[in-house]
Amino acid sequence: MKYPHFRHTVTGVVVPLSAIKSRKSLGIGEFADLPMLGRWAASVGIELIQILPVNDTGFETSPYSALSAFALHPVYARLDDFPEAANPGDIAALRSELKNRRKKPGTVSTVSGITPGNINFDTVLAGKMRILRSMWKTAAAADIKKAEKWAKNNPWVQNYALFSLLKEENELKSWVEWKEFRNPDRKDLSRLWKKKKDKAFFWVWLQWRLEEQFTAASRELDSLGVALKGDIPILINEDSADLWAERDNFNQEFRAGSPDGQNWGFPIYNWEYLRSEDYRWWRDRLNQAAKFYHAWRIDHVLGFFRIWAVPKGDFSAWNGYFKPSAPVTRAELEALGFDTGRITWLSRAHFPGNELREIFGDEAGLVQKMLEQVGSEDLWRSRPDGPDEKEAAASPLSVEAREALYPLLRNKTLLSTGEDSFTPSRNYQSTRGWLSLTGDEKLNLKDLFQRKLNVSESLWEQSGRELLSMMKTDGSMLVCAEDLGAIPPSVPGVLQELGILGLKVTRWSRKWDEPSQPYIPFSDYPELSVATSSVHDSTTLRGWLAGEAFEDKELLKVLGLKEDADLSGSAGVKAVLEALQKAPSMVAAYPIQDLLALIPDCVSENPEDERINIPGTVQPGNWTWRMKISLEELPVLHNLNNALKELCSLRRNQ
């Protein structure tokens, strides 16, 4: 879809599709709900709707854990709109089951559990899939031919259909646990399709129908003058059709993570191979997205500049490093006076025998079996090939001993990144090897590390420019980037050069290096940006104002309010939203919870109940929030709509 070039700054609303509720939707928001949301949005002056990813994640509630970079999630299907015959009683029975579950006694609203109004994802998906299978049995021959024609123009769907069938036949286990077909090549996939096409074609037909529904919804939004903004995660689940069938696109030796120790578990890309293919897989992915979206958000855009790569044998990310990066070579270390023995001392974890016995007691011998002895000394060190954290976890050591061993294995000044190449570890200045160096040796190594960082930053700029330029080649969609966190110096310039919008979140848009860390004035937000009040991984605006930002004098100052002003409740929400509306950002898009909070009656009593996700946690409440107000109710909430019209007019009049 082509992004409409508005002549004014735009107001948008951000809402997970799953969170929308209408009389026709069945337990979760559906593609067919988007036009009704769009009509309400247009009536109050909202011109953009942003949703989270809608790819198939199976029974995983996180929309960022996709089984396919291309396939749509069946959970968003509007069953009543399928031309295929369905037993009306089946749909009514599922609706009744979901209603009864919501009324079940004992379901109390808590931060960590599913509240009565939240999505019961497993039940919804299982029920819909059961009904969809019965519909498939009634599909007309003419429609199957149409689906076959559609499949020829969507070659990804064949491998996805095979993957889905095999996953079902293997009790939904990851492909790495299958007894057969774990490592198919193209010939294997072709033979497998011929053998299993009749069974697998259900998923082809289903994707064809889902694309029909999503395309129709997107086109209706277009006719309303409301742009649809999608979300394209940079990373793909290991247990996905893409990795299973197109292994060469990925570097399975590493998982993506972050320098603070988070291991996200997603394989990183093999950019060299993708480049040799002219980024075919990525171009296909973007073309698929362009069928539905006028604009799209690049999740974790920093990963296109550099990614924190974690060896696959670790479950933490402390032994990770940025790829690409300029390596420290053995020759450079030798030139500084470090011989082979001292390079080994710096690049492997070492364990004095007395330390092992003191820490591990009777289990010290088990630890020593995983290590290698240094000559005949009472000194041990990690092997060239390990142990990594997963090997330690699988050892017969007690839980306490394993927990004590993990940080010791990370005690390396240098990490090996290849034959005769290294990089400094994340916390190298606190390692045993570093603390043993002389002052001059530390200065020399720091100088070398800084020079390598300077070269790496040039590599990151080159990588980001090349990859993001590829993603901008079509030019019809508006491209926005999630550029939060510690960013390399080159990122803002590359985004500006390519016309990609960055992200400005009020609570994190501060001058962190200055005393009192003042907020960046709203008037200083760049034009090429999306301004927002909160994101799906944060508290809501109302929750932030009542918690972290309570009595924040710097916030009051940037809002131009008196020091005794009360920012709690709807008054604080209104003050922040109005300030953001006056920012020069091309787009200001707010979570629907923050817009509803303009009117106290439209929100839950506890703002924590409206959180989408709490990062780093696995709990039933994550990704299951659902609006308590239906789409049918929105147009008659006159106080809310009047407040939104007034808010949106601030942008239109700029």
Name each region found by the language model.
Residues 1-654:
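Catalytic cores of glycan-processing enzymes that make or break glycosidic bonds
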